[in-house]
């Protein structure tokens, strides 16, 4: 807009006018440049201006300060009133400020001095008078005694750089508040826009009259001058009418309310900024010339303006009287209206065109190049033509010419520089641009040789090119006349364009990264972004996570565009885990149509995906997968076709709502387009991305609260069937008569003879179900039930966890049997036992023989026994009938009876018969013997201690929070904090058995069903008066003896443990504790009454109970307790030769080494940094860094070494195979189709199973993420188990929580264990430590059946939980970005856990205590996260902060009404985007570089408020699952140190996984984080290893026992 002037009425000279000294004025300007808060700024200015204020004003300021201190006035109200008082005191009577510093005859606020004064000033300067800019005069202020009214002026703005300075110009401006009836978050209504057009038309008419009259003299009577009270009153009338029509309430014409920190903009929310804005100082001095050059010829300024003075005193008095009357009416109406109106914070004023905030200090204006001409003139310039006169121009008139444009700027009609990617073009806002046009072949970005142009456009479309792997990404505009490829922006536009370039380059990074890493996580993507060096043209040091989140919408749209170039059956890369997390975090809107976006992606078509690489498989594995897939693909593809149309559309997004294209393959098959209608597929242009996202998320979501599922269905028959005596007859005489039952050996049914031991098919009650199969174990007849048989059931493969993947002819033994009537028998069948061959271990990799030659419908086979509750496949139990019970022997009954007998508590070895009770020396339960003097585990509720501890730590009550400072704190309504141990249960109580007794019945006999034990209580350190801090420094297995006793039910005993007096041990305490499980020691006794520690009494030091055991106490008890340990030391087990596939840095192998069961001779790891780390920690291992498929192919081909000369393990060499194959390659979609089946068939899981089949190791372990058991409706799990069963392995699966095995981290892992025939199948290890119950939901649902592992310690454990404090409190303090690879510890270990991890180093050096260097903004956020437990991003203050790089982080604006969360207690808004009002997201609402990340409140309502992001760890809590890249906004969430302003270090993460401090890592910091995050926690691996060791010991004992028997038999 050109600067204009308007004749102004000359005010009378003020009675009191003064000017500020120059030094004060300078200091006021300096304050504006400083980054002070509004409060600080006002305070400083008051100090400067205090001596210039009248006494009356000073008194009023004192009163205001008193009210503020008494909280009678809010801080905002106080600041508003202070500015109001200053505005009054330092202004003239008519509102014109009276400072004596003039510029061009005008005052700062647009009021004009009298012509006389103007001439005097010019004469004094000795210069000819310059043209006076025509300015709009603001409304006049009220007199000092009245309340001020809203200031408003016409939107004409002066853009002079030298302007009059006023006091109020030194205060920050803010938006005017809307009237109460107006919705604060709504954009200007159509009525107000029309009204503004009317106002503009009025101004044009006045201006044209001015031109006709030439130079207007002093204002004529009756003439309405723009900016005067009469025009303002007219505008107010219109506004009042509009509001009345909306609210149907009386509406005042003025609004006196002012927002405390903002002045009202001239012309309301749609007008330009007032003249007082200091941003004009940032413009070039040539701007007035440029602006003038834009005007139409008839709008040119006159050469000279000579304002005349006329006497208007009468008119002034009338206007003043009318104005005061109007103001009183307004005030009365306002008071009435505010009683019912909701007063809330309103939007700051915006430009009506580009919707930018007019008070934004970064708002810029366009500046045309010199001598700029219009677009049409440029396009006809011969310098841009690439043809000579003899050449034809274009092949078609539809082709647009292409040129290059440099030194360009893009702006709206009001002259504001605008970005092009905020949705303005899509909303038909006309954006123009200027610059220097050059021929298309020019590469020089300088404006030399170009043609300067202005007002190009409007822009119809913008497009991107350069996604071809090159270094550059190009941006172009299309207008109605030409296309322009952009080169360099103008200096003014460069900051805006750099943001655009930044997002283009980030999109390029993301697309190219996903091309090669489609299964990457969000943390992996952040790693890629942060490690990519930005192009030099961007003037950026680094890309950050904030950069990605800022441009997330744009980036996702580019990825969607890339996916559209692929085939319809290809997996979209926008469904990769990292993109799904980005879409959720940033609140990206999917499914925007490109046509509506007016954005074109000009890039080469997506390269054809060649599909997955071929996996090397053995014949057995290949046959299983191929056979099953052939049937399942057809079935699932049929289901997909039936459900695709409904399933793939949400019906809400833009893509779903557009019509079919009629051109794609799916449309051509539709009936409406003349097709057959068979495929029933959605139009390819209507493939809903929201539904695809939902399906991908559903595949990975696992419900922690698994509902109660019915147990696997039993095969009981519910009712009797009528006997048919004619078809059933006994063969031979009864072999045995037992009471009423007569047992037979044979029976004839329908001319078919059956005998005991035969197998039969049984008719089910439900005829729709297949026949049941059973072994006949007894035949008898009795008078009540008739002819009966005892059925020992077989379980069909489909009734196991294998489901449909099982062999249809394979059966499994189960411990399930029942009595049945013979009439239920359908026919005789044959069930063959397939025993493993003697050479089983060497048969791997060869062509598998068919287990059954053909299916005749009556022949089946079985190999294994199946546990239906624990999903365990084991070798059939060896139970043989005796001669006297062959006629009715049932292996199932025998085993079930044996188990019941074991479970029943019993007493043995009576000691003494006392009055009322009988004492015993021994009791048994679950096969475990408990003697007097043994230590026992008891539930926490078994007994209490005689000391009253302080109540457990609870969260402090929530105190009132300043919602203005902490606007997101309201989201913390839940007390639950992820990573907190407040709900962690207590560990077991431990007691030493003093007596075992039973009370006597009334008949004098002992009641052996009610066994009691009397125990001496042991105190743990946390149970003493020293409470929890004592346990932190003490050993985890330290106890204190006490003479306190308790009587407990023997049924409550949870297990046996060893408790020894430390001074009596032959070895050191550390060796004793490490020598076996369940070991405790005590050195002192605790007296609860005196709260003192004493020497233990003599009877405590003895492991027996003197005088009670009649010589069976001390010695025998000790030998009984230590018996397993002695056997372990006697039998030396050879270590298993181990191959670790997908080894990573070696966490699994490290745990097995600590358990002492394996020696890892070979490892395969393709990622070089992890392979190097494995080498560092396992120097004797051969580490292969090749593809596992290549290695297996070499071995199967008979090769001995690989290409690098490394010796390959041969068949028979590998005794243990372990690994965690990555399975993300097929984790994107919940349903299989032919392509995902193909991916799975060639996945690393299949390769790993092929390794198992070829090498046939004694033990096999597969470790993976918890969701492994749920992928593809558990299909991955089923097929893995199916392969193992087909190989002949015993196998099982379960989910373990690493936190229960001694790490301060929640990490649930799926484990598949397998053992070769003849080896005992290990159980899963019982938990060692208590842990948060929420993280211990370990059951698995497969096909609506709930499976659990064999673990029995569900509610407690032997040891307390390990905390963050235990893990890392001894590590020295470091800063953000610390990079010293080796430092000293600076202190001794403080906890038991730290002593374990530090080990016994001679000269301890702390390695890898380094942390990521976060960006300046992230560092500032971390610095402002409080240190209180549970703190996260919701505790960030909404303030401006100076960052370490010198930039300023802004406050977050809340401009929208959040329908869900409402307003704050002070009425402030809580929404940051229009989506909270139920509207589509507004691109212009995005905010960046704010201390509170804009994306989190934007999407928080639908993502649990992003609890935990930017969260601090809690000293007494635990880590979330350690990931590969600790990011404050990543999945792991709480990664900030509890007390230091940084993310956790590599060493802290390694400790959270349980790695010893001596364990070496390799590579840069992100490599090391990835190595740690991908590893199996060694303590978890150790626990599993000890279970394998137990099985090996059991077999060794069995072999030793058999050998002794054999030798004895020979003798």
From Swiss-Prot:
Sequence repeats: 1106-1107, 1108-1109, 1110-1111, 1112-1113, 1114-1115
Biased composition (Basic and acidic residues): 178-191, 199-212, 220-265, 279-311, 319-328
SAM-dependent MTase C5-type domain location: 1136-1595
EC number assigned by the record: 2.1.1.37
UniProt-annotated stretches for the region Disordered: 123-328, 594-614, 695-726, 1091-1126
Sites where the protein binds S-adenosyl-L-methionine: 1143, 1147-1148, 1165-1166, 1187-1188, 1574, 1576
Catalytic residues (UniProt): 1223
Residues binding Zn(2+) 2: 661, 664, 667, 683
CDD domains from the UniProt entry: BAH_Dnmt1_I, BAH_Dnmt1_II
Keywords, in A-Z order: Acetylation, Activator, Chromatin regulator, DNA-binding, Isopeptide bond, Metal-binding, Methylation, Methyltransferase, Nucleus, Phosphoprotein, Repeat, Repressor, S-adenosyl-L-methionine, Transcription, Transcription regulation, Transferase, Ubl conjugation, Zinc, Zinc-finger
Protein family: Belongs to the class I-like SAM-binding methyltransferase superfamily. C5-methyltransferase family.
Summary of subunit composition and partner proteins: Homodimer. Forms a stable complex with E2F1, BB1 and HDAC1. Forms a complex with DMAP1 and HDAC2, with direct interaction. Interacts with the PRC2/EED-EZH2 complex. Probably part of a corepressor complex containing ZNF304, TRIM28, SETDB1 and DNMT1. Interacts with UHRF1; promoting its recruitment to hemimethylated DNA. Interacts with USP7, promoting its deubiquitination. Interacts with PCNA. Interacts with MBD2 and MBD3. Interacts with DNMT3A and DNMT3B. Interacts with UBC9. Interacts with CSNK1D. Interacts with HDAC1. Interacts with BAZ2A/TIP5. Interacts with SIRT7.
Protein name as annotated: DNA (cytosine-5)-methyltransferase 1
Gene: DNMT1
């Amino acid at each position: 807009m050109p600067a204009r002037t308007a004749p102004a009425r000359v005010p009378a000279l003020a009675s009191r006018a003064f000017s500020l000294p120059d030094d004060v004025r300078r200091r006021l300007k300096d304050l504006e440049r400083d980054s002070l808060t509004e409060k600080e700024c006002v305070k400083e200015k008051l100090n400067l201006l205090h001596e210039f204020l009248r006494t009356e004003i000073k008194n009023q300021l004192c009163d205001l300060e008193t009210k503020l201190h008494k909280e009678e006035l809010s801080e905002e109200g106080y600041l508003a009133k202070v500015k109001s008082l200053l505005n009054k005191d330092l202004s003239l009577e008519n509102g014109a400020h009276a400072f004596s510093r003039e510029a061009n005859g005008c005052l700062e606020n647009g009021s004009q001095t009298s012509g006389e004064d103007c001439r005097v000033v010019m004469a004094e300067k000795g210069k000819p008078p310059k043209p006076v800019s025509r300015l709009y005069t603001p409304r006049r202020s009220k007199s000092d005694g009245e309340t001020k009214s809203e200031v408003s002026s016409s939107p004409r703005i002066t853009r002079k750089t030298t302007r009059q300075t006023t006091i109020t110009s030194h205060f920050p401006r803010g938006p005017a508040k809307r009237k109460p009836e107006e919705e604060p978050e709504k954009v200007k209504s159509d009525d107000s826009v029309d009204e503004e057009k009317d106002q503009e038309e009025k101004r044009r008419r006045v201006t044209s009259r001015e031109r006709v009259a030439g130079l207007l003299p002093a204002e004529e009577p009756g003439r309405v001058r723009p900016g005067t009270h009469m025009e303002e009153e007219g505008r107010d009338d219109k506004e009042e009418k509009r509001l009345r029509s909306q609210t149907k309430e009386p509406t005042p014409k003025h609004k006196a309310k002012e927002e405390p920190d903002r002045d009202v903009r001239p012309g309301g929310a749609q007008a330009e900024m007032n003249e007082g804005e200091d941003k004009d100082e940032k413009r070039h001095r040539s701007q007035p010339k440029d602006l003038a050059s834009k005007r139409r010829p008839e709008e040119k300024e006159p050469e000279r303006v000579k304002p005349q003075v006329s006497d208007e005193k009468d008119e002034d008095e009338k206007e003043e009287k009318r104005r005061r009357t109007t103001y009183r009416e307004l005030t009365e109406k306002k008071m009435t209206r505010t009683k019912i109106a909701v007063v809330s914070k309103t939007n700051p004023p915006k430009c009506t065109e580009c919707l930018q905030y007019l008070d934004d200090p970064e708002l810029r204006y366009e500046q045309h190049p010199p001598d700029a001409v219009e677009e049409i003139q440029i396009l006809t310039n011969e310098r841009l033509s690439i043809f000579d006169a003899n050449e034809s121009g274009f092949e078609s008139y539809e082709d647009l010419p292409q040129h290059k444009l440099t030194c360009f700027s893009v702006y709206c009609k009001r002259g504001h520089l605008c970005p092009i990617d905020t949705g303005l073009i899509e909303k038909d806002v006309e954006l123009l641009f200027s610059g220097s046009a050059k021929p298309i072949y020019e590469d020089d970005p300088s404006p030399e040789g170009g043609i300067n142009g202005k007002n190009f456009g409007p822009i119809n479309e913008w497009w991107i090119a350069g996604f071809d792997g090159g270094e550059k990404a190009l941006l172009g505009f299309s207008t109605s006349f030409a296309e322009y490829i952009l080169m360099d922006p103008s200096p003014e536009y460069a900051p805006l364009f750099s943001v655009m370039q930044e997002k283009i380059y980030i999109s390029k990074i993301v697309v190219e990264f996903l091309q090669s890493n489609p299964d990457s996580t969000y943390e992996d993507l952040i790693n890629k972004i942060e490690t990519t060096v930005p192009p030099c043209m961007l003037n950026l040091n680094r890309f950050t996570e904030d950069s990605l989140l800022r441009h997330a919408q744009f980036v996702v749209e580019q990825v969607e565009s890339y996916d559209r170039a692929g085939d319809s059956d290809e997996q979209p890369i926008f469904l990769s885990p990292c993109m799904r997390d980005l879409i959720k975090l940033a609140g990206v809107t999917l499914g925007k149509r490109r046509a509506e976006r007016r954005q074109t992606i000009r890039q080469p078509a997506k390269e054809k995906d060649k599909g997955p690489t071929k996996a090397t498989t053995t014949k057995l594995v290949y046959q299983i997968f191929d056979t099953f897939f052939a049937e399942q693909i057809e079935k699932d593809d049929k289901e997909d076709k039936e459900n695709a149309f409904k399933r793939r559309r949400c019906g809400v997004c833009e893509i779903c709502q557009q019509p079919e294209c009629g051109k794609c393959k799916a449309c051509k098959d539709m009936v409406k387009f003349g097709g057959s209608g068979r495929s029933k597929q959605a139009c390819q242009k209507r493939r809903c991305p929201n539904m695809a996202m939902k399906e991908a998320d559903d595949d990975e979501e696992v419900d922690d609260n698994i509902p109660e599922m019915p147990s696997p269905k039993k095969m009981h028959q519910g009712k009797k069937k009528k006997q048919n005596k004619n078809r059933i007859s006994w063969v031979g005489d009864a072999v045995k008569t037992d009471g009423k039952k007569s047992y037979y050996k044979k029976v004839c049914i329908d001319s078919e003879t059956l005998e005991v031991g035969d197998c039969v098919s049984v008719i089910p009650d439900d005829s729709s179900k297949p026949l049941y199969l059973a072994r006949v174990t007894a035949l008898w007849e009795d008078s009540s039930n008739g002819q009966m048989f005892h059925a020992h059931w077989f379980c069909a493969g489909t009734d196991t966890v294998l489901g449909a993947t099982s062999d249809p002819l394979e059966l499994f033994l189960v411990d399930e049997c029942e009595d049945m009537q013979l009439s239920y028998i359908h026919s005789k069948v044959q069930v063959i036992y397939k025993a493993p061959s003697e050479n089983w271990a060497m048969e791997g990799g060869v062509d598998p023989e068919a287990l059954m030659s053909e299916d005749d419908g009556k022949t089946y086979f079985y190999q294994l026994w199946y546990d239906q509750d624990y999903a365990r496949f084991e070798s059939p139990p060896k139970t043989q009938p005796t001669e006297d019970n062959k006629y009715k022997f049932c292996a199932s009954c025998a085993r079930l009876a044996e188990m019941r007998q074991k479970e029943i508590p019993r007493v043995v070895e009576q000691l003494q018969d006392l009055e009322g009770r009988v004492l015993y020396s021994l009791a048994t339960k679950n096969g475990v013997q408990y003697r007097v003097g043994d230590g026992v585990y008891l539930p926490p509720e078994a007994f209490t201690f005689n000391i009253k501890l302080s109540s457990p730590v609870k969260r402090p009550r929530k105190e009132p929070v300043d919602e203005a400072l902490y606007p997101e704190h309201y989201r913390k309504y839940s007390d639950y904090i992820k990573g907190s141990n407040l709900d962690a249960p207590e560990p077991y109580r431990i007691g030493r058995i003093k007596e075992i007794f039973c009370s006597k019945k009334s008949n004098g006999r002992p009641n052996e069903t009610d066994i009691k034990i009397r125990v001496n209580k042991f105190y743990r350190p946390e149970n003493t008066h020293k409470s929890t801090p004592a346990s932190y420094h003490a050993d985890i297995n330290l106890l204190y003896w006490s003479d306190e006793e308790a009587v407990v039910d023997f049924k409550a005993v949870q297990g046996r443990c060893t408790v020894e007096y430390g001074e009596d041990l032959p070895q050191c305490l550390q060796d004793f504790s490490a020598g076996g499980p369940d070991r405790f020691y005590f050195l002192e006794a605790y007296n609860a009454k005196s709260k003192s520690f004493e020497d233990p009494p003599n009877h405590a030091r003895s492991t027996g109970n003197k005088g009670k055991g009649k010589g069976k106490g001390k010695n025998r008890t000790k030998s009984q307790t230590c018996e397993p340990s002695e056997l372990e030391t006697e039998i030396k087990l050879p270590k298993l030769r181990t191959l670790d596939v997908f080894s990573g840095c070696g966490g699994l192998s490290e745990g097995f080494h600590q358990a002492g069961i394996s020696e890892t001779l070979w490892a395969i790891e393709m990622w070089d940094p992890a392979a190097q780390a494995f080498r560092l920690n396992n120097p004797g291992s051969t580490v292969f860094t090749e593809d596992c498929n290549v290695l297996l192919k070499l071995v199967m081909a008979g090769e001995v070494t690989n290409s690098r000369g490394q010796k390959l393990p041969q068949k028979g060499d590998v005794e243990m195979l372990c690994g965690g194959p990555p399975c993300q390659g097929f984790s994107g979609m919940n349903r299989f189709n032919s392509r995902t089946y193909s991916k799975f068939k060639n996945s690393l899981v299949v390769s790993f199973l092929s390794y198992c089949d070829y090498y046939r190791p004694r033990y096999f372990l597969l470790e993976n993420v918890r969701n492994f058991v749920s992928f593809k409706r558990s299909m991955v799990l089923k097929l893995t188990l199916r392969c193992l069963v087909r190989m002949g392995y015993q196998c099982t699966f379960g989910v373990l929580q690493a936190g229960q095995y001694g790490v301060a981290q929640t990490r649930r892992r799926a484990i598949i264990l397998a053992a070769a025939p003849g080896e005992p199948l290990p159980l899963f290890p019982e938990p060692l430590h208590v842990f948060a119950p929420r993280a211990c939901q370990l059951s698995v649902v497969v096909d609506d059946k709930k499976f659990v592992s064999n673990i029995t310690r569900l509610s407690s454990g032997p040891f307390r939980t390990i905390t963050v404090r235990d893990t890392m409190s001894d590590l020295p303090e470091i800063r953000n970005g610390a990079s010293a690879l080796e430092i000293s510890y600076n202190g001794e270990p403080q906890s038991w856990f730290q002593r374990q991890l530090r080990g016994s180093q001679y000269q301890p050096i702390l390695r890898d205590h380094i942390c990521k260097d976060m960006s300046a903004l992230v560092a500032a956020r971390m610095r402002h996260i409080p240190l209180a437990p549970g703190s996260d991003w919701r505790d960030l203050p909404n303030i401006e902060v100076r960052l370490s790089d010198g930039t300023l982080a802004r406050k977050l604006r809340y401009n929208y009404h959040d329908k869900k969360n409402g307003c704050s207690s002070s009425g402030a808004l809580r929404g940051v985007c229009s989506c909270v009002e139920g509207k589509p997201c507004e691109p212009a609402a995005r905010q960046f570089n704010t201390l509170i990340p804009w994306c989190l409140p934007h999407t928080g309502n639908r993502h649990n408020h992003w609890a935990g992001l930017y969260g601090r760890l809690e000293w007494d809590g635990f880590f979330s699952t350690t990931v590969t890249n600790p990011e404050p906004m990543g999945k792991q969430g709480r990664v900030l140190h509890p007390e230091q302003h940084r993310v956790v270090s590599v060493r802290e993460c390694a400790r959270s996984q349980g790695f010893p401090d001596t364990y070496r890592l390799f590579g840069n910091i992100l490599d090391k984080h990835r190595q740690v995050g991908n590893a199996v926690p060694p303590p978890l691996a150790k626990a599993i290893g000890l279970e394998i060791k137990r099985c090996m010991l059991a077999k060794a004992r069995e072999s030793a026992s058999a050998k002794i028997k054999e030798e004895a038999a020979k003798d």
